[in-house]
Every structure is written in C-alpha cells, then in structure tokens.
C-alpha cells in the first residue's frame, strides 16, 4: 500500500484529499504544519508527500527542501499560488510536480502514480539502508544532503554488505564476489577496504556501520 504524507493548514482540504486517496487504497497521514509532519517522519516512512506552500511557521518551500535533502521523499506541491516565480522556487526547492488549486482529485491521483513510477525506475539502481543510500549508476553514497563518490571496489564491497544486512561474509566470500575466483593478491586487501569504508561512513555520519565478527568475517549493522 502507498503511504502518502499530506501537509496543508486547510483542514477541510486535508479531509477532502485524504478521503479520496483512501478510496484508492492510498494510506494517508495528514498534518497542518511542516513541523508536525517532520516529527512524524522521525519514526515513520512514507512513499510520497503532498505539500501546500502557504503555511504558518515552516512554509512549503522549506518543508519540500527538507523532505528532499533529509528523507529523499518525492514531493508534489499542491497550492493556490500559480505565479511562474512560485513554480520556479518550488522546483528549485526540489519538488517533483506542481499542482494548482482548484484541482481535480483524479488528476492528482494520476500525478502521484506518475511520480512514483519515475522514482521506481530510479530506485532500480539504488539501495537504501538506514539513512544511507547507495547509487550503483554513479558509485556514490548519500546521507542526508552529503554525497560521496567511492572507488569501484569499495562501492561493490559496501553494496554487497548492505544488500545482505546481518549476513556475515568471510574474507574468502568477499574476495570471490568482488575480486573474482582468479584473484591472487593478499586477502588482507579486504581489511584495508573495510577500514576505508568505515572512515567514509563515519565522516558522513551514517547510521550504517561495518562490524567485525571475530573469527568469521564482516557484516553491516544499523546504529539506533
């Protein structure tokens, strides 16, 4: 089931949009302020967010940028503001789509599904574990707004571990999968790569860490 965050200070609109989306089997979580929605996201995950611009406190532009930078959530702006300058600012903030009020709920539904399809295509080359996102296309890792490119072997090693959380890989397992059967170098090269990855993850303040299981090998854990 799709989980949708809706943030708008108009309670009637929240109820209207929520009721229609729920009929389409989309679970909704509604909030009248950006601050409240971010509190919710501390413990819950959503697939997409619908955000108004004009709200007291944190406005929609600021909320959109936070959702994109810190949570990597697709965003649709739903607002009465139709000036080109507002649209420009919204897209610069990271929004994936922009819908002006008044609107047809069916059109909003079409746009939700279209945005999610685009994200699914992008997600095919990405893996997320905790707050760490690994992008295979660019061999880069991202935590929040910080991105770091990794050398090929380091990325492959981290991707292998992150794809199998809690699974313990021996040095031989890792060498076979990353360097290949015909590798003739020192198996301590694995330790060197692990050390570098730990330094990089620490620098990014990732919730993911690489643990040594004494006498067995390595695995990834998420720090709480």
Swiss-Prot record:
<feature type="DNA-binding region" description="OmpR/PhoB-type">
    <location>
        <begin position="124"/>
        <end position="222"/>
    </location>
</feature>
<keyword id="KW-0963">Cytoplasm</keyword>
<keyword id="KW-0010">Activator</keyword>
<protein>
    <recommendedName>
        <fullName>Heme response regulator HssR</fullName>
    </recommendedName>
</protein>
<dbReference type="Pfam" id="PF00072">
    <property type="entry name" value="Response_reg"/>
</dbReference>
<dbReference type="Pfam" id="PF00486">
    <property type="entry name" value="Trans_reg_C"/>
</dbReference>
<dbReference type="GO" id="GO:0000156">
    <property type="term" value="F:phosphorelay response regulator activity"/>
</dbReference>
<feature type="modified residue" description="4-aspartylphosphate">
    <location>
        <position position="52"/>
    </location>
</feature>
<keyword id="KW-0805">Transcription regulation</keyword>
<dbReference type="GO" id="GO:0005829">
    <property type="term" value="C:cytosol"/>
</dbReference>
<keyword id="KW-0238">DNA-binding</keyword>
<dbReference type="InterPro" id="IPR036388">
    <property type="entry name" value="WH-like_DNA-bd_sf"/>
</dbReference>
<dbReference type="GO" id="GO:0000976">
    <property type="term" value="F:transcription cis-regulatory region binding"/>
</dbReference>
<comment type="function">
    <text>Member of the two-component regulatory system HssS/HssR involved in intracellular heme homeostasis and tempering of staphylococcal virulence. Phosphorylated HssR binds to a direct repeat sequence within hrtAB promoter and activates the expression of hrtAB, an efflux pump, in response to extracellular heme, hemin, hemoglobin or blood.</text>
</comment>
<keyword id="KW-0843">Virulence</keyword>
<dbReference type="InterPro" id="IPR039420">
    <property type="entry name" value="WalR-like"/>
</dbReference>
<dbReference type="InterPro" id="IPR001789">
    <property type="entry name" value="Sig_transdc_resp-reg_receiver"/>
</dbReference>
<feature type="domain" description="Response regulatory">
    <location>
        <begin position="3"/>
        <end position="116"/>
    </location>
</feature>
<keyword id="KW-0902">Two-component regulatory system</keyword>
<dbReference type="InterPro" id="IPR011006">
    <property type="entry name" value="CheY-like_superfamily"/>
</dbReference>
<dbReference type="InterPro" id="IPR001867">
    <property type="entry name" value="OmpR/PhoB-type_DNA-bd"/>
</dbReference>
<keyword id="KW-0597">Phosphoprotein</keyword>
<keyword id="KW-0804">Transcription</keyword>
<dbReference type="GO" id="GO:0006355">
    <property type="term" value="P:regulation of DNA-templated transcription"/>
</dbReference>
<dbReference type="GO" id="GO:0032993">
    <property type="term" value="C:protein-DNA complex"/>
</dbReference>
